């Protein structure tokens, strides 16, 4: 493998055995591709905005004399970039401008004669844009739109599994689900009649819908039944015989022909009898006359002479009727063929319960069901029915729905109309009856072929269409009412409803979520999440076990491990690593094609439906060099089941061992040795890890770390290769390679880094360069690390030296004992940034004022504020300190004449304002790192605001001019090259000032042209610079768009440094979580024979019952990695020859059985080897991919190479006594995470505070500054102990005895420790509640 210069800095040893056939895809593509589809112009009009416009336009007026047509649309440029939107608290969006054409037709002239055409571009609101990382900035906060897994449109056949009716009879049903429009359900009742429901309303007999479709009883019977034909000849009754129909029946008479008896009366008819009848080719047999009684007529029989209806269709025949029919000349009688086995009389029975007889009565019945209480008219009833399923505006199956519909009914065509046809409805009913008759199967609704993914683009398009439909109504009315000569398209379109619909979706939809931004992994996982909840999905309460369960079709599409614990389990899932959606929105996963027993590298993506037809081998199946299967029998999956198949039956093979898991689960090394429940916790807890001060790559990883770090977008990645020309903490400049430049550009890429900004979870986002000056970089190399990344690899926690042993009860029940060294070295110190805002409003009594002149506040409290009343940057503040001084006008109080006089003399004004300053919340302390002031347009800016503005302008100018200098230098170096090659002497040129170079003329025409081009570029560059600077200045100096009534907002950013402390929650990656119980002095920790103490002591009892053995293997492998690092470190210290170093590192990389990774250190220069060694000396990072990781033997080999015992256990000594522990202890390096459940955020205490209004009891919870709840059970405990006085004060003065508690407070102040309990307020509430029931209770004094 070829490594780039940057990748050579640190190579992770990979234990993977299987070749990597397919690279890990870009992990955010599900979001980006979907949104791209939504906003890009689609000439076919299938997707996105184009599809929405085409479905609503053209809008015709009611009279048809004019119409508004859609031509095209374009998205403008966003006003602010992403960072500016976040700072200002606005939405990152672009204006949508649509070109519309108003066409007016002549009234009197023939149809289609155009009178007037007007075209105009109309503004249609703002469309939020997606950032490069797949998020949206809405009102200044980053949000993610989660994809939804919903039931695919189409037709589904299902049964109630015998749960509805008490008899346990299985009732079948069919449901036609459109993409938009009314649902149509067909269902059987316990009596086997078929009913229909529209939109889950009251059920009607199913034949009503057929009558409404203009079918008569005769036609209905013709559609659903086969016929039995009787003929009357010579007063004998003969029946046309189809022998097949007789199977399994009992003969009720002798079946004979020409005197030969085939079946005797009372015998069961078998296949042998049928073969005999068929052999003799018998078509007619004579039957007794009674046999026809009870059969059902298949059509109407009319007396030809009188026109009288003798026997209507669907009537049971009797002997009298037979005689009548015979008399009126009907010699051939058609009856329905039914039996109990597989030809039920369902439709015939349904017609009998159907109250309607013709189309009109059927339509009226449907109208009454849909609109109860409204009087039906023929026209209204017809319109309603037409609009339900046959109108393109109201009903749409969508392409997916039509595809699923046709596939379900086994039709060949995949495409078709979006509305239903008569044939569609009849075929669905026929298939449902077939299923009831025992032919065919019901569908599995949890199959991923019946559930599809709706991503951002599609949901945004639907919301946009909703907005457009609202506008459509208004436009129709304007077209009909307005004066068409003066009307322009602009006058008809109101952008408000459209932007309101879009804004509502992005701002408050259940699927638009506040981004989980704890660390890069939580961002990626959030964007790859798939939810079954949300509009048009399930609800938590109604979802049963089946929906939540792992389904065989999840394989390679949805992760079986990563899902939340609690009420949402199984409803919220995560996309598997390689999964993607196909054009219809179904999840598909890649497989390698197997041709003639050879596994090729040809990749096919299969959806769940297609996969069912193939035999698929697992990724860990053994292959030989040619790619043939080694074993004759191979474990494969087929039709959702796993079993052994011979190797020539195999059609496909999995692409990778980590194909079935999600990104989160694929980061857990030795996942294959963990119990699934613990793996679930491990995958979920990695998302809660807080980025530490210095990221530390995991010694034991899975090889996915780099992909996650790069794709998450928190790192700066080189867009093009080149050389590092300049680097500082906030900017990296790359001089681009010649071959990657675009013609006629300066060839400079500038990367500005994010410094100390706040994430959604208040953690710190900061980027640090990891390249040095002059280094070569290639496209895709990581230039700067973000939060929780180390040299471009995900690094959520720290490698800790752990020992598994009990330690004086400090690790009882999952507690964790931590060494003081961990705190001293700041291993788990994290930075949290809080944003505190102070809003100055315009009140009824006058404007609030931000000022340092606050009444009744001492000098000390104001010491950290400047003259504008805003805190200085860099000030250290603690709980209760004033950050922004603000005063609010108080209502005028009635003044006495004396006070009025004094006020007139001394101008004393302080008493009419009250202090409403922004203070630091209790229990928070930290450093102010930034202050921002936003002022409304037209309000005078204070001194601090002007200072900040000045500073921002300076910074912007500096940034831009530096950028200009860099680009200029690049240009001038090219001009220099052209001039020198054109014959100008270099020495003379060096003496000439740069800006005069362009005045020189060259004789070589080609060179002169090049020079002129470069000169043009130079002018353009300067012009561009001026433009950018002007735009920047305008943005900075313009007033801010604040909410109504707000004059000023001051935002203060407070950085809090939090060290690890008892009560913080920590976890490994295997679901092994615990709370820190004690920080132990270093000298007391257990240590080995060399005196190296351990960092963390974990309880060995946390392992066996939880079956997460992965943590033990990780610990051993981590020890080996560290051992090798220490050996390299020793060699570096002794300044060994590079050859020796190279040889040792090479041995470490080559270790293992047929490992796929090949590292050849002979291709590395000595400097590169030394730099690699520098980066390996703290431990050699190792990758052990999921299901394809290091084997026990390999771990032992590696331990041996590191000079460590292969058991992974060593002798420890007690740090307090120096005594040796009795047994050897497992010691090694485990990757530990600090989770975002910090004791500082949870611990809280209250003495006095706020009370609930009704009950007068203290509030609860930290946010309300509440008290401890002394609940029902605690009261029982005191009662049981007979602690009467304690109980009395708990229920009175400490809770809601209002007078008692104020008196008590006074007494304590006076030093008198007495208490007099009174009446608790909650007792009064109880009395009031009883009175509200009309029962009077009065308390009488004895």
Curated annotation (Swiss-Prot):
Catalytic activity field: RNA(n) + a ribonucleoside 5'-triphosphate = RNA(n+1) + diphosphate
The keyword Transferase is assigned to this record: yes
Database matches in Pfam families: RNA_pol_Rpb2_1 (PF04563), RNA_pol_Rpb2_2 (PF04561), RNA_pol_Rpb2_3 (PF04565), RNA_pol_Rpb2_45 (PF10385), RNA_pol_Rpb2_6 (PF00562), RNA_pol_Rpb2_7 (PF04560)
GO CC terms: DNA-directed RNA polymerase complex
Key words, A-Z: DNA-directed RNA polymerase, Nucleotidyltransferase, Transcription, Transferase
Gene Ontology MF, one: ribonucleoside binding
Enzyme type, top EC level: transferase
PROSITE patterns per the UniProt record, alphabetical: RNA_POL_BETA
Signal peptide residues on this chain, from the entry's feature table: none
Cross-referenced InterPro entries: DNA-dir_RNA_pol_bsu_ext_1_sf, DNA-dir_RNA_pol_bsu_external_1, DNA-dir_RNA_pol_su2, DNA-dir_RNAP_su2_dom, DNA-dir_RNAP_su2_hyb_sf, RNA_pol_bsu_bac, RNA_pol_bsu_CS, RNA_pol_bsu_protrusion
Gene3D superfamilies xref list: 2.40.50.100, 2.40.50.150, 3.90.1100.10, 6.10.140.1670, DNA-directed RNA polymerase, beta subunit, external 1 domain (2.30.150.10), DNA-directed RNA polymerase, subunit 2, domain 6 (2.40.270.10), RNA polymerase alpha subunit dimerisation domain (3.90.1800.10), RNA polymerase Rpb2, domain 2 (3.90.1110.10)
EC number: 2.7.7.6
KW Transferase (keyword) present: yes
GO terms of biological process kind: DNA-templated transcription
NCBIfam families: PRK00405.1, rpoB
Family: Belongs to the RNA polymerase beta chain family.
Function statement: DNA-dependent RNA polymerase catalyzes the transcription of DNA into RNA using the four ribonucleoside triphosphates as substrates.
HAMAP family: RNApol_bact_RpoB
Subunit architecture: The RNAP catalytic core consists of 2 alpha, 1 beta, 1 beta' and 1 omega subunit. When a sigma factor is associated with the core the holoenzyme is formed, which can initiate transcription.
Protein name: DNA-directed RNA polymerase subunit beta
Organism: Enterobacter sp. (strain 638)
Lineage of producing organism: Bacteria, Pseudomonadati, Pseudomonadota, Gammaproteobacteria, Enterobacterales
């Amino acid at each position: 493998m070829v490594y780039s210069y940057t990748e050579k800095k640190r190579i992770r040893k990979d234990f993977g055995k299987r070749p990597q056939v397919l690279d890990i895809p870009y992990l955010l593509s599900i979001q980006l591709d979907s949104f791209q589809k939504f906003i890009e112009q689609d000439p076919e009009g299938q997707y996105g905005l184009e599809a929405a416009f085409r479905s609503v336009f053209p809008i015709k007026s009611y009279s048809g004399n004019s119409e508004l047509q859609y031509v095209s649309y374009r998205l403008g440029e966003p006003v602010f970039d992403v960072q500016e939107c976040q700072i200002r608290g606005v939405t990152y969006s672009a204006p949508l401008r649509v070109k519309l054409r108003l066409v007016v037709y002549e009234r009197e002239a023939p149809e289609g004669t155009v009178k007037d055409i007007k075209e105009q571009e109309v503004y249609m609101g703002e469309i939020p844009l997606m950032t490069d990382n797949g998020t949206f900035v809405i009102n200044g906060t980053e949000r993610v739109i989660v994809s939804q897994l919903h039931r695919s449109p189409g037709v589904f056949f299902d049964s109630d599994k015998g749960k509805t009716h008490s008899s346990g009879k299985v009732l079948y049903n069919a449901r036609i689900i459109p993409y938009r429009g009314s649902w149509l359900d067909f269902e059987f009742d316990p009596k086997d009649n078929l009913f229909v429901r529209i939109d889950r309303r009251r059920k009607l007999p199913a034949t009503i819908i057929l009558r409404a479709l203009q079918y008569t009883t005769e036609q209905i019977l013709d559609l659903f039944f086969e016929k039995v034909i009787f003929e009357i000849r010579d007063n004998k009754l003969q029946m046309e015989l189809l022998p097949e129909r007789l199977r399994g029946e009992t003969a009720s008479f002798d079946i004979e022909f020409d005197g030969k008896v085939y079946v005797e009366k009372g015998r069961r008819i078998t296949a042998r009898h049928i073969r005999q009848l068929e052999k003799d080719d018998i078509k007619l047999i004579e039957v007794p006359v009674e046999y026809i009684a009870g059969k059902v007529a298949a059509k109407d029989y009319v007396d030809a002479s009188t026109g009288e209806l003798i026997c209507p269709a669907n009537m049971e025949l009797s002997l009298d009727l037979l005689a009548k029919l015979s008399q009126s000349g009907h010699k051939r009688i058609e009856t329905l063929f039914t039996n109990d086995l597989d030809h039920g009389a369902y439709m015939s029975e349904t017609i009998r319960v159907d109250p309607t007889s013709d189309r009109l009565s059927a339509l009226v019945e449907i109208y009454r069901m849909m609109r109860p209480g409204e009087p039906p008219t023929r026209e209204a009833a017809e319109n309603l029915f037409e609009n339900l399923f046959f109108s393109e505006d109201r009903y749409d199956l969508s392409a997916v729905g039509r595809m699923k519909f046709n596939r379900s009914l086994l039709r060949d065509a995949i495409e078709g109309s979006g509305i239903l046809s008569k044939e569609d409805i009849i075929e669905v009913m026929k298939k449902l009856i077939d299923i009831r008759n025992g032919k065919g199967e019901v569908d599995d609704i949890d199959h991923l072929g019946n559930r599809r993914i709706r991503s951002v683009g599609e949901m945004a398009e639907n919301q946009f269409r909703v907005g457009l439909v609202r506008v459509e109504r208004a436009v129709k009315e304007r077209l009909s009412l307005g004066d068409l000569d003066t009307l322009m398209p602009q006058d008809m379109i109101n952008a408000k409803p459209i932007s309101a619909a879009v804004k509502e979706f992005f701002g408050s939809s259940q699927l638009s979520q506040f981004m989980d931004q704890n660390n890069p992994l939580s961002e990626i996982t959030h964007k790859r999440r798939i939810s079954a909840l949300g509009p048009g999905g399930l609800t938590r309460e109604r979802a049963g076990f089946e929906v939540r369960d792992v389904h065989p079709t999840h394989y390679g599409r949805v992760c079986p491990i990563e899902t939340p614990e609690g009420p949402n389990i199984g409803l919220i899932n995560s996309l598997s690593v390689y999964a993607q959606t196909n054009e219809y929105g179904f999840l598909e996963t890649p497989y390698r094609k197997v041709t003639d027993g050879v596994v090729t590298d040809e990749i096919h993506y299969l959806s769940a439906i297609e996969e069912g037809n193939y035999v698929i081998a697992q990724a860990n199946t053994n292959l030989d060099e040619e790619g043939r299967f080694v074993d004759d029998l191979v474990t494969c999956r087929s039709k959702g089941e796993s079993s052994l198949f011979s190797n020539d039956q195999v059609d496909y093979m999995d692409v990778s061992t980590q194909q079935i898991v999600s990104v989160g689960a694929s980061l857990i090394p030795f996942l294959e040795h963990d119990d699934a429940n613990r793996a679930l916790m491990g995958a979920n807890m990695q998302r809660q890890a807080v980025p530490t001060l210095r990221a530390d790559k995991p010694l034991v990883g899975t090889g996915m770390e780099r992909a996650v770090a790069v794709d998450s977008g928190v790192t700066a990645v080189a867009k093009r290769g080149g050389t590092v020309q300049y680097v500082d903490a906030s900017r990296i400049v790359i001089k681009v390679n010649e071959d990657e430049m675009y013609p006629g550009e300066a060839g400079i890429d500038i990367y500005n880094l994010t410094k100390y900004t706040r994430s959604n979870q208040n953690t710190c986002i900061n980027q640090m360069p990891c390249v040095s000056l002059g280094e070569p970089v290639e496209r895709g190399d990581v230039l700067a690390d973000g939060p929780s990344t180390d040299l471009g690899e995900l690094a959520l926690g720290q490698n800790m030296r752990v020992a598994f042993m009990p330690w004086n009860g400090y690790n009882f029940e999952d507690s964790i004992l931590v060494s003081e060294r961990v705190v001293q070295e700041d291993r788990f110190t994290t930075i949290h940034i809080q944003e505190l805002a102070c809003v100055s409003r315009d009140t009824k009594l006058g404007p609030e004022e931000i000022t340092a002149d606050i009444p009744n506040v001492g000098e000390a409290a104001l010491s950290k504020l400047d003259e504008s009343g805003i805190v200085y940057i860099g000030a250290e503040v603690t709980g209760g300190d004033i950050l922004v001084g603000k005063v609010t006008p108080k209502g005028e109080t009635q003044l006495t004449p004396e006070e009025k006089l004094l006020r007139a003399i001394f101008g004393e004004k302080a008493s009419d304002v009250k202090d409403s300053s922004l203070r630091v919340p209790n229990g928070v302390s930290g450093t102010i790192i930034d202050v921002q002031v936003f002022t409304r347009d037209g309000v005078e800016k204070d001194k601090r605001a002007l200072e900040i503005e000045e500073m921002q302008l300076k910074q912007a100018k500096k940034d831009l001019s530096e950028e200009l200098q860099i680009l200029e230098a690049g240009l001038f170096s090219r001009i220099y090259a052209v001039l020198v090659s054109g014959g100008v002497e270099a020495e003379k040129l060096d003496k000439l000032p740069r800006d005069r170079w362009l005045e020189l003329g060259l004789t070589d025409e080609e060179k002169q042209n090049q020079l002129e081009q470069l000169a043009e570029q130079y002018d353009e560059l300067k012009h561009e610079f001026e433009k950018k600077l002007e735009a920047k200045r305008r943005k900075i100096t313009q007033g801010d768009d604040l909410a109504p009534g707000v004059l000023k907002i001051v935002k203060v950013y407070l950085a809090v440094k939090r060290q690890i402390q008892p009560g913080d929650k920590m976890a490994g990656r295997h679901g092994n979580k615990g709370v820190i119980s004690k920080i132990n002095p270093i000298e007391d920790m257990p240590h080995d024979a060399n005196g190296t103490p351990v960092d963390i002591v974990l309880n060995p009892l946390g392992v066996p019952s939880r079956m997460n053995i992965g943590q033990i293997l990780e610990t051993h492998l981590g020890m080996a990695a560290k051992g090798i690092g220490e050996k390299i470190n020793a060699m570096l210290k002794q300044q060994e020859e590079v050859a020796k170093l190279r040889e040792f590192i090479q041995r470490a990389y080559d270790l293992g059985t047929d490992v796929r990774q090949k590292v050849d250190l002979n291709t590395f220069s000595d400097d590169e080897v030394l730099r690699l060694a520098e980066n390996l000396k703290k431990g050699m990072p190792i990758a052990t991919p999921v299901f394809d990781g290091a084997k026990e033997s390999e771990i032992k080999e590696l331990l041996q190479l590191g000079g460590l015992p292969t058991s992974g256990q060593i002798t420890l000594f007690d740090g307090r006594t120096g005594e040796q522990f009795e047994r050897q202890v497992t010691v090694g390096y485990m990757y530990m995470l600090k989770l975002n459940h910090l004791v500082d955020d949870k611990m809280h205490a209250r003495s006095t505070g706020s009370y609930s209004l009704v009950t007068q009891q203290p509030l609860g919870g930290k946010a309300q500054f509440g008290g401890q709840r002394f609940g029902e059970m605690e009261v029982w405990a005191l009662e049981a102990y007979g602690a009467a006085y304690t109980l009395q004060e708990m229920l009175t003065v400490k809770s809601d005895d209002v007078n008692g508690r104020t008196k008590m407070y006074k007494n304590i102040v006076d030093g008198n420790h007495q208490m007099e309990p009174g009446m608790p307020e909650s007792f009064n509430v109880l009395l009031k509640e009883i009175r509200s029931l009309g029962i009077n209770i009065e308390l009488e004094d004895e």
